[in-house]
UniProtKB/Swiss-Prot annotation:
The keyword Endoplasmic reticulum does not apply. GO terms for biological process: translation. Disulfide bonds: none annotated. One of its GO terms (cellular component) is ribosome. SUPFAM superfamilies: Nucleic acid-binding proteins. The lineage of its organism: Eukaryota, Amoebozoa, Evosea, Eumycetozoa, Dictyostelia. It is found in: Mitochondrion. This is Small ribosomal subunit protein uS17m. Belongs to the universal ribosomal protein uS17 family. It holds the Pfam family Ribosomal_S17. Keywords: Mitochondrion, Ribonucleoprotein, Ribosomal protein, RNA-binding, rRNA-binding, Transit peptide. GO terms for molecular function: rRNA binding; structural constituent of ribosome.
Amino acid sequence: MISKIFEIVHKHQKFISGVCISKTHTKTAMCQVKRLYFDKGKYSALNYKTTKYMIHDPNDICAVGDQVHFRECAPVSKRKAHVVEKIVKKNPITEFLRQNPQYIVTPKEIAERKENDKIKYKHITDL
């Protein structure tokens, strides 16, 4: 009953749609929102403005590349005042890697490959 009342009260809150660009902290995601605007400058062109939001992700369901809907809420921290509502579209690369873990490459493997790919120069006297 109380949840229905809260749904009615918060119905006026608009959702913001964006893409998750960073997930370095627990329960926090950085989302980027692109907005189209008309630039009335010399050439009168349509341009995009991007805004970054730190959003609260209480269940840690976001991943980098996901399209999410989020809304305003009471401030959770100094820079976080938005909360995730739902994930609209999952990142297809993340889903593929989750289903096929054999393709995941660790930073240690990358460093080893770089070391093996280096050209090993020898002095002429060593030949």
